[in-house]
């Protein structure tokens, strides 16, 4: 019992010390760049990465004459292409499939950086309903990389998106769906004011997508005490929540009204 009492006393001492450190750190916000900055000693260690997240309603997609993928959004327009050499022109082949009406798609999070906000990367998730496909059509899909895989995290959003039309979760359990993920890279542009954009071969699509922009790398610091290590995650959240970290403007984006060879036709 004596050992338990001593242990409890040590824990209470640690908790009291932790609370004092936390309250002291809060008081330092006005004297430091941020709460996070107040909690570090000198020295360098791995960076803390912070993201600014916004959303765009996209309408997917049209194929351009030079085989790029044009995606029109309410905030931005996107010109994309397949990232992997083996996937080159894959989407062009997929949208020409005679059984494309059995395909369901979902755009992944769009990633960019503060340094090059116009350059983006993302993925396209595809689910193929096999129930009405012939053996020959299944062979064609297999040659294009569709496989019988379990759901990955990126596919779960598809369940909600298409719930009124089809129960993808049920079909997945019944092994009636094949999947394909296509990595995409490209650029995003600001729509030109007053322009009416037309994309040839447009395939109707509507989806809300998140855009994650890396806005700052904060160097953490070495020789941190126990209070620092425990408080850092909470402090990083507090900095963002209280607006201490300013969100930069997208200086790198250009207004787009390109020629037909580039995909967007302005009228």
From Swiss-Prot:
Source organism superkingdom: Bacteria
The protein's name in its UniProt record: Uncharacterized protein PM0758
Organism: Pasteurella multocida (strain Pm70)
């Amino acid at each position: 019992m004596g050992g338990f009492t001593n242990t409890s006393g040590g824990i209470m001492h640690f908790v009291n010390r932790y609370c004092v450190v936390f309250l002291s750190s809060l008081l330092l916000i006005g004297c430091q760049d941020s709460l996070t900055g107040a909690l570090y000693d000198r020295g360098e260690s791995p960076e803390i990465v912070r993201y600014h997240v916004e959303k765009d309603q996209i309408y997917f997609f049209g194929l351009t004459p030079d085989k790029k993928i044009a995606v029109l959004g309410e905030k931005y327009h996107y010109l994309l292409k397949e990232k992997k050499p083996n996937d080159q022109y894959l989407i062009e082949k997929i949208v020409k499939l005679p059984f494309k009406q059995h395909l369901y798609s979902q755009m992944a999070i769009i990633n960019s950086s503060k340094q090059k906000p116009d350059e983006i990367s993302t993925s396209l998730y595809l689910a193929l309903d096999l129930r009405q496909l012939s053996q020959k059509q299944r062979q064609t899909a297999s040659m294009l990389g569709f496989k019988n895989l379990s759901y990955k995290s990126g596919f779960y959003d598809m369940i909600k998106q298409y719930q009124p039309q089809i129960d993808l979760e049920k079909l997945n359990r019944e092994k009636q769906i094949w999947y394909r993920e296509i990595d995409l890279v490209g650029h995003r542009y600001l729509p030109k004011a007053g322009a009416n954009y037309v994309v040839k071969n447009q395939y109707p699509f509507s989806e809300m997508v998140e855009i994650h922009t890396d806005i700052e790398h904060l160097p953490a610091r070495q020789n941190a005490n126990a209070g620092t290590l425990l408080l850092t995650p909470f402090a990083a959240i507090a900095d963002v929540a209280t607006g201490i970290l300013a969100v930069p403007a997208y200086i790198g984006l250009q207004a787009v009204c390109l020629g037909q060879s580039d995909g967007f036709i302005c009228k």
